[in-house]
């Protein structure tokens, strides 16, 4: 018996759905059974994000970092919230790490502490907005 597990992710739900359809079509060609499980909702870049503006400003103040914005597949778990509340303003940030989803995956604990402290400052600043 061969089992293949995939977790399709995309910032665009239609692309994620298209990939799932391709996988199901390919499986059908070989008469494989396909079971669809949980779906991670995507969320697209919001050019008018007030939360991102605050985050950018606070990262500069706290860490003297000029943020570089980039889209990745990481952090899409927050899309679960976006799937339920599409008008929600969402950002993702986190500690340093490497080797995601591999046996070599690790988390930099000092960076984790810094990000936890930063999160507390960010939430405090958010309540003043």
Locate the predicted segments by residue.
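A short beta-alpha structural unit
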Residues: 4-12, 32-52, 73, 77-79
């Amino acid at each position: 018996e061969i089992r293949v597990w995939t977790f399709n992710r995309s910032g665009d739900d239609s692309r994620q759905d298209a990939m799932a359809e391709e996988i199901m079509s390919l499986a059908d060609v070989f008469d494989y059974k396909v079971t669809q499980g949980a779906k991670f909702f995507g969320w697209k870049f919001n050019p008018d994000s007030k939360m991102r503006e605050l985050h950018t400003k606070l990262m500069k103040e706290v860490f003297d970092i000029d943020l570089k914005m980039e889209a990745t597949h990481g952090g899409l778990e927050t899309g679960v919230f976006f799937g339920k509340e599409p008008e929600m303003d969402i950002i993702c940030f986190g500690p340093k790490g490497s080797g995601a989803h591999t046996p070599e995956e690790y988390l930099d604990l000092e960076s984790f502490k810094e990000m936890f402290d930063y999160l507390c400052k960010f939430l405090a600043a958010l309540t003043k907005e």
